[in-house]
């Protein structure tokens, strides 16, 4: 009897994401086992249970997916799982907490592609402002932008101290330089907007972080990209279906939540399929997701 493809879904939360379960099933996993309230200290034991119970041949048909809501903890869990294995007992690993790794990758790839319509340098040397940037998608998108050569600001509506704390913590974990910013007051937010080449709306669903009045201040803005699909739009004037569409009243191109979401979906699907089909075990995190997002966009062009 041929061994089934098994995916173990691990989360520190109280439930796994139905989105991730559906994506795993559609990628061809035949058995999907959820594990909740998983702490970092439990990762080694769970990983070794998964690898030793199937032998080297069964390991090739076994995967571990790390979810949750904490992008830093997910990275630590992924690393702990990787270090808990040794040849020939190795399985494939993939972290995507709350879809943030693949969403951030899609957001950055779409932004980069839009920028390159105007400047071949893309994100390199650009000042990127992430409004709502202390959340899951904002932190990861900030790291990816910084790795591409951008000067990154994670803005918080709770003030500069909050933004700087998130920037320092995230930058330290992933080896990049990020800066904090405040969007707490109109004056603070508009000062940041006036200096930004790229503005990303990465706040919670249904929260507008750039108004029409704010937009008028952002005269340097080349791309406005929003991941909020719930009205009102996170960045005023950016429609959910916009895909590098001129943003009224500005010289910028607009990228909406569904344009990003379509790429995100394809990225997660492809990575799960590649994980299942891999001849040798793979470990996927957000830099890998950005590579796949660029592939998706290259196929569209």
Residue spans of the language-model regions?
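Rossmann-like adenosine-cofactor binding region
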Residues: 176-254
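Short glycine/serine/threonine-rich phosphate/pyrophosphate-binding segments
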Residues: 104, 135-141, 163-164, 207-210, ...
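Conserved active-site and cofactor/substrate-binding residues in soluble primary-metabolism enzymes
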Residues: 38-41, 72-76, 102, 106, ...
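Glycine-rich phosphate/diphosphate-binding loop of Rossmann-like nucleotide-binding domains
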Residues: 113-198
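N-terminal ligand-binding/catalytic initiation module
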Residues: 1-88, 288-301
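Glycine/charged-rich beta-loop-alpha catalytic/anionic-binding loops adjacent to active sites
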Residues: 86-94, 124, 248-251
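A glycine-rich, Thr/Ser-enriched phosphate-binding loop motif common to dinucleotide/cofactor-binding enzymes
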Residues: 94-113
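Adenosine-phosphate binding glycine-rich loop
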Residues: 2-3, 230-301
């Amino acid at each position: 009897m041929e061994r089934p493809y098994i995916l173990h879904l691990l989360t520190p939360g109280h439930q796994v994401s139905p989105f991730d379960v559906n994506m795993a099933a559609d990628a061809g996993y035949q058995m999907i086992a959820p594990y909740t309230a998983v702490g970092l200290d439990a990762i080694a034991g769970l990983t070794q249970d998964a690898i030793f119970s199937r032998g080297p041949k069964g390991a090739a048909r076994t995967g571990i997916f790390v979810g949750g809501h904490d992008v830093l903890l997910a990275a630590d869990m992924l690393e702990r799982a990787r270090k808990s294995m040794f040849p020939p007992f190795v399985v494939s690993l993939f972290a995507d907490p709350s879809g943030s790794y693949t969403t951030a990758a899609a957001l950055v790839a779409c932004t980069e592609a839009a920028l390159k319509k105007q400047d071949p340098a893309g994100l390199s040397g650009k000042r990127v402002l992430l409004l709502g940037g202390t959340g899951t998608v904002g932190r990861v998108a900030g790291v990816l932008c910084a790795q591409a050569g951008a000067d990154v600001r994670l803005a918080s509506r709770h003030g500069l101290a909050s933004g700087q704390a998130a920037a320092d913590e995230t930058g330290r974990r992933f080896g990049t330089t990020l800066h904090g910013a405040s969007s707490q007051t109109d004056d603070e937010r508009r000062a940041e907007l006036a200096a930004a080449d790229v503005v990303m709306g990465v706040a919670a669903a249904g929260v507008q972080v750039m108004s029409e009045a704010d937009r008028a201040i952002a005269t340097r803005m080349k791309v406005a990209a929003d991941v909020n699909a719930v009205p009102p739009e996170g960045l005023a004037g950016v429609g959910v279906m916009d895909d590098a569409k001129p943003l009224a009243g500005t010289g910028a191109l607009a990228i909406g939540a569904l344009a990003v979401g379509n790429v995100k979906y394809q990225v997660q699907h492809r990575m799960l399929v590649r994980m299942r089909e891999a001849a040798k075990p793979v470990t996927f995190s957000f830099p890998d997701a950005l590579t796949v997002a660029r592939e998706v966009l290259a196929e569209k062009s």
